[in-house]
Amino acid sequence: MRKINSALKPLKGDVSVDADKSISHRAVIFSALAPGKSIIKNFLQANDTLSSCSCLRQLGIKIAAMDSEMQVYGRGLSGFSEPHTVLDCGNSGTTMRLMAGLLSAQPFLSILNGDESLNQRPMKRIIEPLGIMGANIQARQNGNYPPLVIRGNRLSGLSYQLPVASAQVKSALMLAALNADSETLLSEPQKTRDHSERMLTAMGADIAVNGLEIRLKPGKELQATEFLVPGDISSAAFFMVAASIIPGSELLIRHVGVNPSRAGIIEILNEMGARIKLENERTISGEPVADLIVSHSRLQAIDIDGAVIPRLIDEIPILAVAMALAEGESTVRGAAELRVKETDRIAAISTELAKMGADIRERSDGFVIKGKPDSLKGGRVASKGDHRIAMSLAVAALAAKGESVIEDSEVVNISFPRFWDLLNTLTS
């Protein structure tokens, strides 16, 4: 539980957010597939990414942790050992889905399990296409929900149109495709984060990307490499919005990943009237990186849907906070995927912001918010066990009148362990 009072002064300073969760997951998993030592600098030491490390260690991969650096001693595409126990993915959907793709072709039995939240998340979206490739995966409720029981099998490539825009599904199929006996062609309905494609390209995989199509040919051994993980734009988003809504604020957020497939939050906030500038733009380990300068502004309402949704799907809860304090009516459509995240994020953010005085109405695939500056009041709100809901409500509390209490606040450790310390530093 955390008590948060209205911000009494502008947020000013030079900050760095925790490392990118998506890239950290992929870096450690792909490194396990490359023979030799890979080095991952600025690896995110959070509950979700450590679940991936734990699963890989149970599969025989040596991973040495040195401060924020990980040294991974990969054993090749076929170098894994049969686990002696169930592989615990914790709360991490990325761990479970990517590991399912990796394990589908391994010549042994493995079982993937998660916590109560993860075991309610849909898995048929990976089980069906992996099954077409030849995978043998069983799951609860007619193949819908974890635990997953995987009996390794010989896989064939496939040509597949993804029914949902999901980078986790795409990445699971790409991992399976590395061990298939023929080429795989994947087509996305909308562009999703492309960290897997960039990383596999850098590691020497035979992969070609053309718009929404990905073509991957098996047979090439991945090369061990060194990664430097940038700051997570999804974590930076909380401070982008905080600086935008607290009068007089100006923050410099250093070393943030600004991959175009993830940077929808910057574009949409700027369209709302935010003042976010990118400086010192560079490319590090194949990923675009920049320093962000964010200062206070009066925000205007906006409607979002379509192709931008996958590019800011994780940022929609904090975007709802910005919309609640913007002038006018905002609408989010096409975001039904939020209902099957760690919690039903549409219901969670709608219910909890309403407790703080927001005029918000749920839709099946989003919400409508009638925003008004200075409209929020303090209250007792719940994270629903979801890290992004907790951090979004914390930012809302800074702009609300009076004290707020956030229940189950330590859930931020899933993705951003330093969140509360950083927030306290900026507001003390």
Curated annotation (Swiss-Prot):
3-phosphoshikimate binds at K21, S22, R26, S166, Q168, D314, K341. Phosphoenolpyruvate binds at K21, G93, R121, Q168, R345, R388. GO terms for biological process: amino acid biosynthetic process; aromatic amino acid family biosynthetic process; chorismate biosynthetic process. Pathway: Metabolic intermediate biosynthesis; chorismate biosynthesis; chorismate from D-erythrose 4-phosphate and phosphoenolpyruvate: step 6/7. GO terms for cellular component: cytoplasm. Signal peptide: none annotated. It catalyses: 3-phosphoshikimate + phosphoenolpyruvate = 5-O-(1-carboxyvinyl)-3-phosphoshikimate + phosphate. GO terms for molecular function: 3-phosphoshikimate 1-carboxyvinyltransferase activity. InterPro entries: Enolpyruvate_Tfrase_dom, Enolpyruvate_Tfrase_sf, EPSP_synthase, EPSP_synthase_CS, RNA3'P_cycl/enolpyr_Trfase_a/b. It comes from the Bacteria. The active site is at D314. Belongs to the EPSP synthase family. PANTHER family: AROM/DEHYDROQUINATE SYNTHASE, PENTAFUNCTIONAL AROM POLYPEPTIDE. Monomer. Catalyzes the transfer of the enolpyruvyl moiety of phosphoenolpyruvate (PEP) to the 5-hydroxyl of shikimate-3-phosphate (S3P) to produce enolpyruvyl shikimate-3-phosphate and inorganic phosphate. This is 3-phosphoshikimate 1-carboxyvinyltransferase. It comes from Syntrophomonas wolfei subsp. wolfei (strain DSM 2245B / Goettingen).
